[in-house]
From Swiss-Prot:
It is found in: Cell membrane. The complex is composed of 2 ATP-binding proteins (YtrB and YtrE), 2 transmembrane proteins (YtrC and YtrD) and a solute-binding protein (YtrF). PROSITE patterns: ABC_TRANSPORTER_2. This is ABC transporter ATP-binding protein YtrB.
Length: 292
């Protein structure tokens, strides 16, 4: 469906992306992860052609988007904030988007507006953060695109609204085979929704793989010791997930027998091997406490 080939982009002399390649298939939800400033938003803006790559190619169903702008009618981008929407009401936004997206489904949009009880007469800027997110998603899905680019869609909203937003995404993919490329600092959302993920680090896209396969690469070990082994563990560059008294929880690659042997040599009184979640893998890859 969408294919990025060796995409590179520098902004103000700083290399943001370098030789990034990725293919997202029809009906796939792909999670894009990375620290703040790693280039996630830049990548979405490049696909939507809001900004242009210095080199590389973006294809939709084999057609180069830059040379065939009408292809963008199949793609919609939902940024973290959308100041363009601010001065318009729902109906005004529908009128605008119908001109851009010929497949825009007004009936479906109205149905979702009623379901989520979003005020139709208020201007976008007058809505709460949660309602803004829901309205943006309603408009994005009603445009009937093949690919939706979502930048932090659940940022700043309460738990109930977040649940509704996530369910709307899942339903859309299940019912219409829509593809979604999503960035989010809420790793539990990514873990719940995505088929595959990739990490943006050092200007490149790494570890593009099935989410379950990625989690299978690591093992979480909970141990208890008679003595303080904190320094010894950290000197081996073993990610420490938690320490509570004599209990230590670490994360290591399953294939790293050397680190596992080192931990065994510390003679733990307790040794429990546990499944991992995506946030723990993220910490293991990027180190330290999460700062994104």
């Amino acid at each position: 469906m969408i294919e990025l080939r060796q995409l590179s982009k520098a902004i103000d002399g700083n290399q943001v992306l370098k030789d990034v390649s990725l293919t997202i298939e029809k009906g796939e939800i792909f999670g894009l992860l990375g620290r703040n400033g790693s280039g996630k938003t830049t990548m979405l803006r490049l696909i939507q052609q809001i900004i242009f790559a210095d080199s590389g190619t973006i294809l939709f169903d084999g057609v180069e988007i830059k040379k065939h702008p009408k292809v963008k009618q199949n793609i919609i981008y939902m940024p973290v904030q959308n100041p363009f929407y601010d001065k318009y009401t729902y109906k005004q936004l529908v009128d605008i988007l119908r001109r851009i997206y010929p497949k825009f489904d007004v009936t479906y949009a109205n149905e979702l507006m009623n379901r989520y009880e979003i005020p139709e007469t208020k201007k976008y800027r007058e809505l709460s953060t949660g309602l803004k997110k829901q309205l943006s998603l309603v408009l994005s899905f009603a445009a009937r695109p093949a690919l939706i680019l979502l930048d932090e869609p659940t940022d700043g909203i309460d738990a109930v609204t977040r649940h509704d937003v996530l369910q709307l995404m899942v339903d859309e993919v299940a019912e219409r085979d829509t593809s979604i490329l999503i960035t989010s600092h809420r790793l539990e959302d990514i873990e719940r929704m995505c088929n595959r993920i990739g990490f943006l680090e050092d200007n490149s896209l790494t570890n593009v793989m099935d989410l379950d396969e990625l989690k299978e690469e690591y093992i979480k070990i909970q141990m208890a010791f008679d003595t303080d082994v904190n320094l010894a563990i950290r000197e081996q560059n073993i990610p420490m997930l938690d320490q509570a008294g004599v209990f230590y929880t670490v994360l290591i690659p399953k294939s790293d027998e050397e680190k596992k042997s080192f931990l065994r040599e510390l003679k733990p009184k307790v040794w429990n091997e546990l499944p991992v979640n995506l946030e723990e893998v993220f910490i293991a890859k990027f180190g330290g406490k999460r700062r994104w």
